[in-house]
Amino acid sequence: MNTLTNVKKSQGIMMFIILLLSYIVFASNWVAGSNLSEKIVFHYFNGEQVSPMVSEVINYTITIARIFANLVAAYILLKLNPRKASIVALVLLCFSFVAVFATNYWLYTIARMIMALGGSMIMVYMNTVVARFIANDEKIIASALVTASYNIGAGLVAIIFFLYKDVVISDW
């Protein structure tokens, strides 16, 4: 019985680490995309002047997707186990690759929206993993990491933009 508990705990910790790192990557992608939104709009509209509303579509759609994801995440978790639900969220998060290679602004917007869905689901599932698999004396540390994960991602982007700004914004 003790071996089974240790295996379950180690799997839970591994799942938590994967979800935490995934959310940090999501946050980095989100912050970088937000910081580069002017250049992204300029790129997709070939330098033409567009309504400020068009350039804000990304932020609004991602906010809507994240609200939707928070509501749907619990339902998906009830229908699937935490591992399968997390895999679904990670697959949705992979739509960031579609966004990077999108050929038009609207495909980019849809891909970012789906990616945001996955990111929000990951946040919900991290809390579930903490509650289910992390020992009570370690939960406060895990919860602090969950809370800090977005800021860690944003901090990484700030460091990268500070050190490599010319490289990051060139060749748009």
Spans of features found by a protein language model:
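Extracytoplasmic
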Residues: 14-45, 52
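Small-residue-rich transmembrane alpha-helices and their cytosolic helix-loop interfaces
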Residues: 23, 59, 63, 143-151
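Residue-level signature of mid-helix packing/kink "hotspots" within the transmembrane helices
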Residues: 31, 62-71, 155
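Juxtamembrane helix-start elements in MFS-like secondary transporters
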Residues: 50-59
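Conserved MFS/SLC helix-loop-helix module at the cytosolic interface between two early adjacent transmembrane helices
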Residues: 68-103
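Paired small-residue
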Residues: 106-114
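Cytoplasmic helix-loop-helix junction between adjacent transmembrane helices
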Residues: 113-149
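Helix-loop-helix hairpin linking two adjacent transmembrane segments in secondary transporters
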Residues: 145-172
